Amino acid sequence: QMEGRSATAYSAARDTAARLPVEMLRAMPGYDGWLAYPVWTLVRFGRWQGVLAEPLPLAEFAYATAVSHVARAIAQARLGNLEEAGRESAEAERNFALLPAESFQGFNPVTALATIARSLSAAEAARARGDWDAAAAKLTEAVTVEDGLRYNEPSDWYFPVRHVLGPLLLEAGRNEAAEALFRADLERNPENGWALT
C-alpha cells in the first residue's frame, strides 16, 4: 500500500483474508478485522465501485462487518449518494453495537477503532456536502485517536488517516496546514509516497 501498488496490495489483502480459517477467527475473537483488508485496500486507492462490489464478511464477525459498512458508506459519499451512505453508516452502527464494550482488535480497543471509522465516514459525508471545515475537523479527530493507538505491525487501523486529511486540506486551499501534516506523517512513516507527493 505505501508504495502505491494497488493491484499488488489488493491481491495480498485478498490472499490474506482468504487464508484465515473461519474456525480460527471464531476461536480467537479480535482478529476478524483482517477480513476487511480487501475492502479497505480498495478505499485506500479510491476504487469506489470496487468497494461496493466487494462481498461483506460473514455476519457473525461483527467488527469486520461494521468496518466494511463504513467502507461502503465512504464509497457512497464519494459517489454523491448521501442517502445510501447514511444507510451504510446505520448498518455499521448496528454491527458495532453487537460488540462488547471491552472488545479489542489486535492490540487496540474497538472503541478507538470505531471512532476512527465513524470520523472517516462523517468526514466523507461532510466533504460531499462541501463542508470542508467539518470534514477536516472529523479527520483531525481521527488522527488524534490514531496517534494514540498501541503499535502493531501491520497497524490495527487500515492506513494512516493523515493520508486522507492531507489531500482534503490541499483541496480546501490550506496548503501550509497540509505541508505540516505531511511532514508529521513522514516522521511516522518515512519515505512514503502518500506524504511525499
Locations of regions flagged by a protein language model:
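Solenoid-like repeat scaffolds
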Residues: T16-M28, E54-Y63, E93-V110, V143-N152, ...
